From Swiss-Prot:
The keyword Transcription regulation does not apply. Acetyl-CoA carboxylase is a heterohexamer composed of biotin carboxyl carrier protein (AccB), biotin carboxylase (AccC) and two subunits each of ACCase subunit alpha (AccA) and ACCase subunit beta (AccD). One of its GO terms (cellular component) is acetyl-CoA carboxylase complex. This is Acetyl-coenzyme A carboxylase carboxyl transferase subunit alpha. Keywords: ATP-binding, Cytoplasm, Fatty acid biosynthesis, Fatty acid metabolism, Lipid biosynthesis, Lipid metabolism, Nucleotide-binding, Transferase. GO terms for molecular function: acetyl-CoA carboxylase activity; ATP binding; carboxyl- or carbamoyltransferase activity. One of its GO terms (biological process) is fatty acid biosynthetic process. It is an enzyme of class 2 (transferase). Residues 36-286 form the CoA carboxyltransferase C-terminal domain.
């Protein structure tokens, strides 16, 4: 059963009416209601607040990494383990083909259902997950394979065990190594891009965000708690943090925004997956045609956070 957010209640009501019209076999009513539904969807989704966009980024029906991998990756083979400690199910790594292009795909997977969410640790990777991702990145470099990364995490796992095994070192090592990989790298934030947990697989030649995804140094709720000691300030925090794709594109922190289906990726995962596939293939062609892509990646990373100070 589809899950509707509070601001989608009118959409839910019209959808229910369409289903009743189908049961009655009333094609005329169905056609009228579908036009009304399209109009309502456009009205709602063209006027979303930043808080509503955050809700969409976390929508329970939103496609996760494994959904996209199942839809766009063919002849796939999953790889496990980090060769040091364990296999982290919050990070998934695959070798396969996207439109006959051999590729390595690395994704953060939140899981569905209680059992699978626990298995995936709710998409919060441990150090062994980031080391598994780095292992696969080095594999891709050795065999000259492009890398697609799918980012979707509330953040790296903050548990004691993770810290004991070097969580910060694992993330920092990925930032260093991914910056100098000698193969094309493309990263897409598909839902939540939470802090260092997202950055660890977001250093790339091309960094894109899905239209209703977020990218932030801390959750808005965490920001509100720290700065104002008041969870009700979450919406204020969202505006101040500038976590939406449009804000981050204007700031030069991401390269592209991938538009979602009219009702969001959670209503049409097939179209969303195809859009990601086409973006990857287009971005890959652009990178491969650039003989200086490594230097351009370096310069892009070095320019982040730069500013000019004037003395008056």
């Amino acid at each position: 059963m589809a899950i509707y957010l509070d601001f989608e209640n009118h959409i839910k009501e019209i959808q229910n009416e369409i289903e009743l019209a189908l049961i009655r076999g009333d094609e005329d009513a169905k056609e009228i209601l579908e036009k009304r539904l399209d109009k309502e969807v456009k009205s709602i989704y063209s006027n979303l607040t930043d808080f509503q966009k955050l809700q969409l980024a976390r929508h329970p029906d939103r496609p996760y990494a494994m959904d996209y991998i199942d839809l766009i990756l063919k002849d796939k083979y999953e790889v496990f383990g980090d060769r040091h400690y364990n296999d982290d199910k919050a990070i998934v790594c695959f070798i396969g083909k996207i439109d006959n292009v051999p590729v390595v795909v690395i994704g953060e997977e939140k899981g569905r259902g209680t059992k699978n969410k626990l298995l995936r640790n709710f998409g919060m990777p441990n150090p062994c997950g980031y080391r598994k991702a780095l292992k696969m990145a080095k594999f891709a470099e050795k065999f000259n394979l492009p890398i697609l990364m799918l980012v979707d995490t509330a953040g790296a796992y903050p548990g004691i065990g993770a810290e004991e095994r070097g969580q910060s070192e694992a993330i920092a090592k990925n930032l260093q190594e991914f910056a100098s990989l000698k193969v094309p790298t493309i990263s897409v934030i598909i839902g939540e891009g939470g802090s260092g947990g997202a950055l660890a697989i977001a250093v790339a030649d091309k960094l894109a965000m899905m239209e209703y995804s977020i990218f932030s140094v801390i959750s808005p709720e965490g920001c509100a708690a720290i700065l104002w000691d008041d969870p009700s300030k979450t919406e204020v925090a969202i505006k101040a943090m500038k976590i939406t794709p449009r804000d981050l594109k204007e700031a030069g922190l991401i390269d592209d925004i991938i538009l979602e289906p009219s009702k969001g990726a959670h209503r049409d995962k097939f179209s969303a997956a195809n859009t990601i596939k086409e973006y990857f293939l287009d971005a890959l062609r652009t990178i491969q045609q650039d003989p200086h892509f490594l230097e351009n990646r370096y310069q892009k990373l070095m320019s982040l956070g730069s500013f000019v100070e004037s003395m008056n």
